[in-house]
Amino acid sequence: MSATIEREFEELDAQCRWQPLYLEIRNESHDYPHRVAKFPENRNRNRYRDVSPYDHSRVKLQSTENDYINASLVDIEEAQRSYILTQGPLPNTCCHFWLMVWQQKTKAVVMLNRTVEKESVKCAQYWPTDDREMVFKETGFSVKLLSEDVKSYYTVHLLQLENINTGETRTISHFHYTTWPDFGVPESPASFLNFLFKVRESGCLTPDHGPAVIHCSAGIGRSGTFSLVDTCLVLMEKGEDVNVKQLLLNMRKYRMGLIQTPDQLRFSYMAIIEGAKYTKGDSNIQKRWKELSKEDLSPICDHSQNRVMVEKYNGKRIGSEDEKLTGLPSKVQDTVEESSESILRKRIREDRKATTAQKVQQMKQRLNETERKRKRWLYWQPILTKMGFVSVILVGALVGWTLLFH
């Protein structure tokens, strides 16, 4: 099976057909209703206006007045794999994120982005980075950091999630890939596969637990790549025939726009081909991945790619990064080039709005804390004044009494 995919990869490379193949997938993807995401009360729960969960596959929050969260359940029955693909939490949705993790009985969260990329906030800081716990009063949860294992390109956190109302606690593994550029690909399949198998070894992807929560910024590009590669490798381990294009089309029925660029599609093939060596019984392959990935070196900086490509999620355009299109009919390429600049500006504006909104919320929190302190002072001020006055009288009386009898 891996030989078939390898031949397909070589043909696509030789014929420079990654762009056309990607466009085929994009154009053949179905569009499904996503009305709930567009409700007025849910607008501030979406990081991007054009990335929404379908109504039929969206994850619903339980025991809340509003059950909406921008997250989709991707269920691949033949591989016995279920993933929750979601956007990077916003400041106002971190509480909903942890509620979802609890209700879905998730064992691990896989994070494939940095909180800030290219000076834009891509994700709120929803987990603690020190000994101080984070409390989410809106949904009644707290999160503590138990341990942290930092590698050169990923970090594993062990978190304690507590239901404040019941006192019940659960341990959640947080796998954070720190060097995967937005709209780009990891430096090598070896580093990615080493990370993927690290996640697998935790057991969090098996049907014995609730679905793993996987997110990047929008929950479609990097998250889609991770899910596609893992699913293909599972099917190959089972001896099943794997049609990568068809599998991706099936996964796109659950969440729009999975895999955002031809480069991500090409990288998925590379990772599947390399990962298949392990399924064939090459026991030393994981050791080679670890050596090639150099995970034990000091953490390195994120290498962002300054490229833009126009993406269309099942018929709806969204902003991407600059990348010239090749191998397309001239009319299609001209249309893409004409609209790429305006689409990029739109994505940048949305990122700036999200950043501004986060800063405004932080300012409001500081103002609220200042106001609470002021009210506490106004409450105690007259009491303390009276106590001081009474103390002065008592001291005066004591002094007078002492002088009188001496």
From Swiss-Prot:
It catalyses: O-phospho-L-tyrosyl-[protein] + H2O = L-tyrosyl-[protein] + phosphate. Residues 371-406 are annotated as: Mediates interaction with STX17. The modification Phosphotyrosine is found at residues 22, 68. One of its GO terms (cellular component) is plasma membrane. Substrate binds at residues 182, 216-222, 260. The keyword 4Fe-4S does not apply. It is an enzyme of class 3 (hydrolase). The active site is at residue 216. The modification Phosphoserine is found at residues 52, 293, 298, 304, 320, 339. One of its GO terms (molecular function) is syntaxin binding. Pfam families: Y_phosphatase (PF00102). Belongs to the protein-tyrosine phosphatase family. Non-receptor class 1 subfamily. This is Tyrosine-protein phosphatase non-receptor type 2. It comes from Mus musculus. The lineage of its organism: Eukaryota, Metazoa, Chordata, Craniata, Vertebrata.
